[in-house]
Amino acid sequence: MFAYFRGRLTSAMPDEAVVDVSGIGYRFLVSAFTYRQLPPPGEDVLLYAHLSVKEDAFLLYGFSSESERQLFRLLLLTTGVGPKLALAVLSGLQVHEVHEAIMANAPERLYGISGVGKKTAARIILELRDRILKMSPDGGKTIASGSGGNLALQIKDDALNALITLGFSKPAAQKAVTGILEGNPSLSVEEVVKSALVSIHNS
């Protein structure tokens, strides 16, 4: 419903921010990461928005980047993960760190986050990796076909599809994947994706 809000930051705390947009104050629930990106009160700010509708309330969640909002929505697809826990994950790790944990099948990286136990971490890894494959542009067919074709090309396509599904633009994903494979063509799909996430984040 809402893409983003641009206005004047009137107040901020580690878990929420109030933005004045044309005389109307909007309260956003935010992650610790977004809180650290906020300007001082009184300055202009842009927050990417997600609206959560409950029986008794409409809650706005605000994010400092589109990639953080995309990951928040992806986390909500996990069984047992609601907005509060998804926000906790984003407060505990940066976006690229969560991506890396998912693609590297490393649930132990999520254990230290408040509210995330071993079972929840394992579900996040399992369910999001599966959804990434299913949501890829080719429906996961390239990844599913383990035989035939050029292995290097298959690895490149698999990594590219995974990055696009995670919300990165195709040009950015192609640039990162191509550069990484040129330097080390023997990497696995997971290693390429992990390196690409770091490359895109630092670019």
From Swiss-Prot:
Transmembrane segments: none annotated. Its main location: cytoplasm. Residues 65-143 are annotated as: Domain II. Pfam families: HHH_5, RuvA_C, RuvA_N. Gene3D superfamilies: 5' to 3' exonuclease, C-terminal subdomain, DNA helicase RuvA subunit, C-terminal domain, Nucleic acid-binding proteins. Residues 1-64 are annotated as: Domain I. Residues 151-203 are annotated as: Domain III. One of its GO terms (biological process) is DNA repair. GO terms for cellular component: cytoplasm; Holliday junction helicase complex; Holliday junction resolvase complex. The keyword DNA-binding applies. Residues 144-150 are annotated as: Flexible linker. It is found in: Cytoplasm. GO terms for molecular function: ATP binding; four-way junction DNA binding; four-way junction helicase activity. InterPro entries: DNA_helicase_Holl-junc_RuvA_I, Hlx-hairpin-Hlx_DNA-bd_motif, NA-bd_OB-fold, RuvA, RuvA_2-like, RuvA_C, RuvA_C_sf. It comes from the Bacteria. Keywords: Cytoplasm, DNA damage, DNA recombination, DNA repair, DNA-binding. NCBIfam families: ruvA. Homotetramer. Forms an RuvA(8)-RuvB(12)-Holliday junction (HJ) complex. HJ DNA is sandwiched between 2 RuvA tetramers; dsDNA enters through RuvA and exits via RuvB. An RuvB hexamer assembles on each DNA strand where it exits the tetramer. Each RuvB hexamer is contacted by two RuvA subunits (via domain III) on 2 adjacent RuvB subunits; this complex drives branch migration. In the full resolvosome a probable DNA-RuvA(4)-RuvB(12)-RuvC(2) complex forms which resolves the HJ. Belongs to the RuvA family. The RuvA-RuvB-RuvC complex processes Holliday junction (HJ) DNA during genetic recombination and DNA repair, while the RuvA-RuvB complex plays an important role in the rescue of blocked DNA replication forks via replication fork reversal (RFR). RuvA specifically binds to HJ cruciform DNA, conferring on it an open structure. The RuvB hexamer acts as an ATP-dependent pump, pulling dsDNA into and through the RuvAB complex. HJ branch migration allows RuvC to scan DNA until it finds its consensus sequence, where it cleaves and resolves the cruciform DNA. Has three domains with a flexible linker between the domains II and III and assumes an 'L' shape. Domain III is highly mobile and contacts RuvB. HAMAP family: DNA_HJ_migration_RuvA. This is Holliday junction branch migration complex subunit RuvA.
